[in-house]
């Protein structure tokens, strides 16, 4: 029972999800605050559930406090019951009221189901009920059945004194609901008219009673006045006894006639209202009979729809049987095709066995070549290490040789400069000797010194000598002139010493400039650098060619390895396919006939395939193996020779210094990268 109720709840929840609401309404927790239900009611009947009423529902109660949720749910349920009693004229005395406390605290599904039943009743009875009914009809049949059951429970709980109409809904469709709703609307309109007529009748009856009371009061007053002898009027004048023909009698008579006329009019109106009420009762009976007829017709429609559903189910079963028949036919055709494929696979399996044997031989041969390749790789690595050590030794020796050559050249230049200085000194000594012989030492010394002195100092000395002569001629015997002469002589000696040191410095600089000319050195270095750059470009080109050759060889080796692995995988795939084909052949032979399967031995096929496997296969000739090994050896030797030549050409660059060689890019990295590949 609980499972069925939960099923009804989930059906109502699926219908509620189809509504376009702003608040979340996908599960029980989102419905427990009452916000989504209030928005749905506002959407169904905005004239009853107004926006001001919706504003009273606190949307901030979600997941905060269950008491706030309970207050929201109380407002919603009370408004729902008011709507049913005032607008729809439903008295839900037998319907169990939803427990809002259990919904707010525990999200009870049973209580939520009752709340959703009430919401469903509002949707079906509102002004836009046609659209909501069509939305319900678009749902699945199981959901429609549960929704119809919920509506039946809601309709059955109405008060019997109200003459409620139980809506009979079919399990397969909800179209009969529309006729019932139309009749219910007509019944509600007639009830409204009866209610209005009854109201008018009550008003007229009240008016009649009031008139009767007024008449009785007037009659009592009339009787009292008749029995009294004297009556004083309002103005204090005695009216005298009530007698025929008196003024008072005539006044009372006139009032009595007026009251009688009013009474007659009220009685006529009452009779008219009675006739109208009888007419409306007859119309109501006719409408009730029409409703009964329509209910019968709806029952017939439901039975016819049930029959149609049964026929549909039988038609669906017939279609399923036809589809199964077609599938069995296709399976029979596939079985015949499989027989043919088994024969083809047997032929292919024999070919695959032969190919498998060939692939195994190829794998063995490739394994041998793989071992040889590994040996060659190790030898190449050893040779590269030896080459590196020898090249490092060669570089050191070249560096030492260059240093020694530089020292030798420096010593040779120093020797040449010393020899030249010796010759120059000899010549000067000879000249000095000749000068001493020819003239005085002072004159020769001054001549030699003047020749060696620069022109500025010579002019200064001549000027000083001229001044000295003038002073000697003008003041020959004075002490001041003697002092001046001594000062001039001291200055001359100082200048001569400075001149001598300058001459020595000039000679040393001239010898140094002759021995080390920077322009010549720059030109020679430029030529050497150009030659070295050309050699470097040539060697780099050779190195790139050797690297490309080695990379192509490495690619070939990797390609052969990949081919070998691919062949091995193909052999394994062929073997597995062969096993599958053998199993299929056994199954097909067994499926032909069990008697034939017992007569035919399945092991015969295995023996046949074993014999086919043991047959000798053509082997690779010895000449082909020798050609492959010789080609591989030649390829390895060529690659090694190219690498060594490029390395030696780079290391033995003519005219390069140690620093210039260190600036060049080492080609060893590319070779090591080639080896690692």
Curated annotation (Swiss-Prot):
The keyword Acyltransferase does not apply. Residues 135-436, 478-588 form a coiled coil. One of its GO terms (biological process) is cytoskeleton-dependent intracellular transport. The keyword Coiled coil applies. It holds the Pfam family HOOK. One of its GO terms (cellular component) is microtubule. One of its GO terms (molecular function) is microtubule binding. It is found in: Cytoplasm, Cytoskeleton; Endosome; Synapse. Residues 6-123 form the Calponin-homology (CH) domain. Keywords: Coiled coil, Cytoplasm, Cytoskeleton, Developmental protein, Endocytosis, Endosome, Microtubule, Synapse. Its main location: cytoplasm. It comes from the Eukaryota. InterPro entries: CH_dom (IPR001715), CH_dom_sf (IPR036872), Hook_C (IPR008636), HOOK_N (IPR043936). Involved in endocytic trafficking by stabilizing organelles of the endocytic pathway. Probably acts as a cytoskeletal linker protein required to tether endosome vesicles to the cytoskeleton. Involved in modulation of endocytosis at stages required for down-regulation of membrane proteins that control synapse size. Not involved in synaptic vesicle recycling. Required in R7 cells for boss endocytosis into multivesicular bodies (MVBs). Has a role in regulating adult longevity. The coiled coil domain mediates homodimerization. Homodimer. Interacts with microtubules via its N-terminus. Belongs to the hook family. This is Protein hook. It comes from Drosophila pseudoobscura pseudoobscura. The lineage of its organism: Eukaryota, Metazoa, Ecdysozoa, Arthropoda, Hexapoda.
């Amino acid at each position: 029972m609980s499972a069925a109720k939960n099923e009804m709840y989930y059906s109502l929840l699926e219908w509620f999800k189809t509504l376009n609401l702003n608040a979340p309404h996908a599960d029980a927790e989102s419905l427990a605050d009452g916000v989504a239900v209030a928005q749905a009611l506002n959407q169904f009947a905005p004239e009853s559930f107004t926006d001001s009423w919706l504003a009273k529902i606190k949307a901030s109660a979600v997941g905060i406090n269950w008491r706030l949720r309970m207050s929201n749910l109380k407002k919603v349920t009370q408004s729902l019951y008011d709507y049913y009693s005032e607008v729809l004229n439903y008295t839900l005395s037998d319907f169990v009221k939803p427990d809002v406390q259990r919904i707010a605290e525990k999200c009870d599904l049973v209580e939520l189901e009752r709340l959703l039943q009430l919401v469903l009743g509002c949707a079906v009875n509102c002004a836009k009920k046609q659209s909501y009914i069509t939305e319900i009809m678009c749902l699945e049949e199981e959901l429609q059945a549960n929704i119809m059951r919920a509506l039946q429970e809601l309709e059955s709980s109405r008060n019997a004194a109200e003459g409620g109409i139980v809506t009979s809904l079919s399990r397969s469709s909800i179209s009969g609901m529309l006729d019932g709703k139309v009749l219910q609307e007509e019944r509600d309109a007639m009830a409204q008219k009866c209610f209005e007529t009854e109201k008018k009748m009550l008003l007229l009856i009240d008016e009649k009673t009031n008139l009767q009371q007024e008449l009785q009061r007037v009659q009592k007053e009339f009787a009292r006045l008749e029995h009294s002898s004297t009556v004083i009027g309002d103005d204090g004048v005695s009216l005298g006894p009530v007698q025929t023909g008196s003024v008072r009698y005539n006044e009372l008579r006139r009032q009595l006639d007026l009251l009688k006329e009013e009474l007659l009019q009220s009685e006529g109106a009452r009779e008219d209202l009675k006739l109208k009420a009888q007419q409306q009762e007859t119309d109501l009976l006719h409408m009730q009979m029409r409703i009964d007829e329509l209910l019968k017709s709806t029952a017939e429609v439901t039975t016819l729809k049930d029959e149609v559903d049964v026929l549909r189910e039988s038609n669906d079963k017939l279609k399923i049987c036809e589809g199964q028949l077609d599938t069995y036919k296709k399976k029979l055709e596939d079985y015949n095709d499989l027989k043919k494929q088994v024969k083809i696979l047997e032929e292919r399996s024999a070919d695959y066995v032969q190919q498998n044997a060939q692939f195994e031989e190829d794998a063995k041969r490739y394994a041998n070549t793989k071992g040889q390749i590994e040996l060659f790789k190790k030898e190449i690595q050893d040779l590269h290490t030896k080459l590196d050590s020898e090249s490092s030794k060669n570089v050191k020796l070249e560096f030492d040789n260059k240093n020694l050559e530089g020292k030798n050249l420096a010593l040779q230049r120093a020797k040449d400069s010393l020899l030249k200085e010796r010759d120059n000194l000899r010549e000067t000594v000879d000249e000095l000797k000749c000068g001493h012989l020819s003239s005085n030492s002072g004159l020769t010394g001054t001549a030699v010194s003047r020749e060696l002195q620069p022109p500025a100092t010579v002019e200064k000395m001549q000027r000083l000598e001229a001044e000295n002569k003038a002073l000697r001629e003008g003041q020959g015997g004075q002490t001041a002139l003697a002092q001046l002469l001594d000062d001039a002589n001291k200055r001359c000696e100082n200048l001569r010493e400075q001149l001598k040191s300058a001459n020595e410095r000039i000679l040393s600089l001239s010898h140094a400039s002759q021995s080390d000319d920077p322009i010549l050195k720059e030109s020679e270095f430029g030529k050497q650098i150009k030659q070295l750059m050309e050699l470097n470009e040539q060697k780099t080109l050779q190195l790139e060619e050797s690297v490309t050759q080695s990379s192509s060889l490495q690619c070939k080796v990797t390609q052969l390895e990949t081919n070998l692995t691919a062949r091995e995988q193909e052999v394994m795939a062929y073997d597995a396919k062969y096993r599958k084909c053998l199993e299929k052949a056994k199954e097909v032979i067994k499926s032909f006939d069990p008697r034939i399967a017992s007569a035919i031995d399945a092991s015969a096929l295995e023996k046949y395939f074993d014999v086919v496997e043991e047959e000798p296969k053509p082997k690779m000739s010895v000449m082909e193996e020798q050609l492959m090994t010789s080609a591989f050896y030649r390829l390895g030797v060529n690659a090694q020779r190219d690498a060594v030549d490029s390395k030696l050409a780079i290391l033995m660059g003519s005219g390069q210094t140690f620093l210039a060689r260190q600036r060049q890019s080492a080609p060893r990295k590319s070779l090591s990268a080639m080896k690692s590949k």
